[in-house]
Amino acid sequence: MTAEDIVQNVFLKLFEKLDTINDFGSIRFWLLKTARNEVYGYFRRAKNHKEEALEENEELLTDTNLGREIEEKEAQEIVRNEIDLLPTELREIFVLREYSELSYEEISQMVGVSKEIVKSRLFSIRQKLIKNVSKRIGV
């Protein structure tokens, strides 16, 4: 699933729910919230289908770049695991900024804290992730 698939799913859901939305000013918020939920769902499914993905990619074993690809996938998995370990509110802020690419202002409105708190929490999250990932990969 790609980012385009996620966006398509969000707009399909909007189309299905269009008749139930009374305030068209809230569509932007609804879209952001639905996109966030789709991204979370993507990560849940990716985590659940990890073994299936490995089976589907057995042909990679003959690839000359296998070592590098395995290291990259392992690093991505470590980062995903560390993100999953974050408290829900911090994980939400991180995902909204890094994966959904929302502005600090948009995130602050969605989670109900000031823009400065969002910036501060993102700084702390990034520092924590760097520290924990570095420990796990032995850097």
Where are these regions (language model features)?
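Short, charged helix-capping/linker segments at alpha-helix termini
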Residues: M1-N9, K17-G25, I137-V139
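Internal acidic/polar
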Residues: H49-Q76, S103
